[in-house]
């Protein structure tokens, strides 16, 4: 017998599958072959049936300095307050010329709505691009009027001439019989100190993004969306080595382990892996024209399950929630948003923490090496960095459903190998890095396992970089990069799979830069770039798009390969981009 109020698929999922047909393609059908403009394989956010209400945040703004770009927000009229879906759309462009990649952020009431970086222009190409983010889980924030800002610092002068332009809007899809209102968090709370919003600078491992909050007293689930972006000396953290090796291999120090650590009242509460984003000016700008690296234009937050702490957080006392970046070495920018589901039938949820094996496991990697330096000063060998932690965090909450026991069981691992070949004429460094998360969140009522959420996440990175002299007194720098993102999720009830999905996003890029004897760039050759994005789920949804380019021009684009009828099709309520969802939302609690 099931606990009172539960069904096998939950009223939300049952209603959706009973009422909806499969949505259409996620990208436009027009071919990009021959284009030099930004071209990506990523899916856009699938939409429910119906006409959305549109709220413009800003339109046609020019970003030429570091001044504020504030905007006022009010919920749309005529769409109700319980929406089927909310989508952020933003469009950016940069005038042709010279300009660095820049960080772009959109905020509302202290909460981050979008985070990414810009495409670098060239002397002949004025790139433009479109980004989207599913903000349905932030509906509680969007039901209230507020103030926001676009943060996009830029420098325009006689040298750096590229002017960045941007517009952004929110699309609200009203709930209907065919598109029921989404089950969303009841509270959406930022951790930053800026009431309008801005990222927090974390200079070292001890620098916190933190906030002390007195929270609602009826929390039954809690999550934290985390973004940690490398900047300045940390931009190329994935190529750095421990300080003791830096001089020998002529690389940045500080090591290459980075990981976001979440704590509650100083107690470890979870881990958010850091993605090795490479910006469009990174390593060799030609690598990323016209296709940037994985998520470069649109970062994806990682969602940390804090539900075992729900009972503790509901006790009416102030609690400090914090994020630190282990290994930060001047510096990271961080954003974090707390998402709380509240019991609609109780004013007070009581409970506590039962077990936390993450406490006492410091994020300290093991370092090894096979480096050898001969009598001529030639260096060869590798430096390895490894850390793997398995932990279990368990807690309980007395809710209107009864006592709910929640457990997060997770293994987070990091491996990095930096291989070097250095002699009088050659410098070669090969980076092989893999960050992985294998976890399961379980929720029980008595003997009944009412929700189970599995995640298998991988961030592979390979960078092969070499610098060699040429016969004419110049130099060549050859680079090959592979970036990947894969995520497999599965939701179960009573041992049966309710939903499963697989997301894969890979980018492979290569180029060779030519330098004269004074290290001025004189040209490049051999530029190639390819991206493949794939999604499949247990409902029959399928998305696959591949793009390839040579010398900055799109040479091939294919959609729907391997999908039924050769077409991309997904249900509107799924997340083909791999963006986070709350693990047990499909069960209706």
Regions found by a protein language model. Give the residues of each.
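Bacterial N-terminal signal peptides that target proteins for export
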Residues: 2-14
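Bacterial N-terminal signal peptides
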Residues: 12-24
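Beta-strand-rich ligand-recognition modules
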Residues: 29-70, 74-80, 91-187, 197, ...
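Extended extracellular/luminal ectodomain segments enriched in beta-structured repeat modules
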Residues: 78-87, 215-223, 234
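Compositionally biased low-complexity segments at domain edges in trafficked proteins
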Residues: 182-206, 213, 346-414
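A short secondary-structure junction signal
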Residues: 203, 207-209, 232-240
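Short, contiguous, pocket-lining structural segments
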Residues: 205, 216, 254
């Amino acid at each position: 017998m099931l606990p009172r109020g539960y069904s096998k698929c939950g009223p939300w999922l049952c209603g959706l599958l009973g009422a909806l047909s499969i949505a259409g393609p996620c990208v436009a059908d027009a071919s990009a072959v021959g284009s030099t403009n930004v071209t990506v394989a990523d899916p856009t956010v699938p939409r429910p049936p119906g006409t959305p209400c549109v709220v413009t945040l800003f339109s046609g703004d020019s970003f030429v300095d570091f001044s504020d770009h504030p905007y006022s927000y009010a919920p749309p009229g005529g769409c109700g307050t319980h929406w089927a879906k909310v989508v952020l759309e933003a469009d950016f462009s940069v005038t042709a010329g010279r300009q660095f990649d820049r960080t772009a952020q959109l905020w509302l009431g202290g909460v981050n709505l979008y985070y990414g970086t810009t495409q670098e222009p060239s002397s002949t190409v004025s790139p433009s691009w479109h980004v989207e983010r599913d903000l349905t889980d932030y509906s509680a924030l969007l039901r209230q009027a507020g103030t926001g800002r676009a943060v996009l610092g830029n420098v325009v002068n006689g040298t750096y001439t590229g002017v960045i332009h941007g517009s952004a809007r929110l699309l609200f899809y009203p709930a209907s019989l065919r598109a029921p209102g989404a089950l969303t968090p009841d509270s959406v709370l930022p951790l930053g100190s800026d009431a309008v919003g801005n990222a927090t600078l974390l200079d070292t491992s001890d620098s916190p993004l933190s906030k002390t909050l007195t929270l609602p007293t009826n929390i039954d689930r809690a999550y934290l969306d985390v973004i940690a972006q490398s900047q300045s000396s940390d931009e190329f953290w994935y190529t750095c080595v421990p300080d003791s090796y830096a001089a020998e291999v002529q690389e940045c120090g500080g090591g290459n382990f980075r990981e976001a650590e979440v704590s509650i009242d100083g107690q470890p509460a979870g881990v958010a892996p850091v993605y090795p984003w490479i910006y469009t000016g990174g390593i060799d700008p030609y690598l990323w024209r016209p296709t940037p690296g994985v998520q470069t234009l649109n970062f994806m937050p990682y969602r940390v399950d804090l539900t075992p702490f729900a009972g503790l957080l509901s006790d009416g006392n102030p609690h400090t929630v914090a994020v630190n970046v282990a290994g930060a070495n001047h510096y990271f920018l961080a954003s974090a948003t707390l998402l709380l589901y509240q019991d609609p039938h109780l004013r007070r949820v009581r409970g506590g923490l039962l077990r936390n094996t993450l406490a006492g496991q410091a994020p300290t990697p093991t370092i090894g090496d096979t480096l050898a330096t001969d009598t001529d000063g030639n260096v060869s060998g590798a430096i390895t960095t490894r850390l793997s932690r398995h932990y279990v965090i368990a807690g309980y909450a007395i809710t209107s459903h009864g006592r709910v026991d929640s457990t997060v069981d997770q293994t987070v691992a990091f491996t990095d190998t930096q291989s070097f070949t250095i002699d009088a004429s050659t410098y070669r460094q090969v980076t092989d890095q893999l960050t992985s998360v294998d976890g399961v969140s379980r929720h029980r009522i008595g003997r009944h396992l009412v929700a189970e959420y599995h995640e298998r996440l991988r961030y592979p990175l390979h960078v092969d970089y070499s610098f060699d002299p040429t016969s004419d007194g110049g130099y060549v720098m050859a680079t090959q990069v592979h970036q990947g993102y894969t995520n497999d999720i599965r939701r179960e009830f009573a041992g049966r799979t309710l939903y499963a999905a697989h997301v894969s996003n890979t980018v492979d890029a290569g180029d060779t830069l030519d330098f004269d004897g004074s290290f001025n760039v004189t040209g490049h050759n051999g530029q190639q770039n390819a991206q493949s994005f794939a999604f499949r789920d247990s409902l029959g949804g399928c998305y696959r798009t591949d793009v390839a380019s040579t010398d900055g021009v799109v040479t091939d684009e294919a959609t729907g390969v391997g999908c039924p009828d050769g077409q991309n099709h997904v249900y509107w309520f799924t997340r083909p981009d791999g963006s986070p969802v709350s693990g047990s939302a499909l069960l209706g609690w």
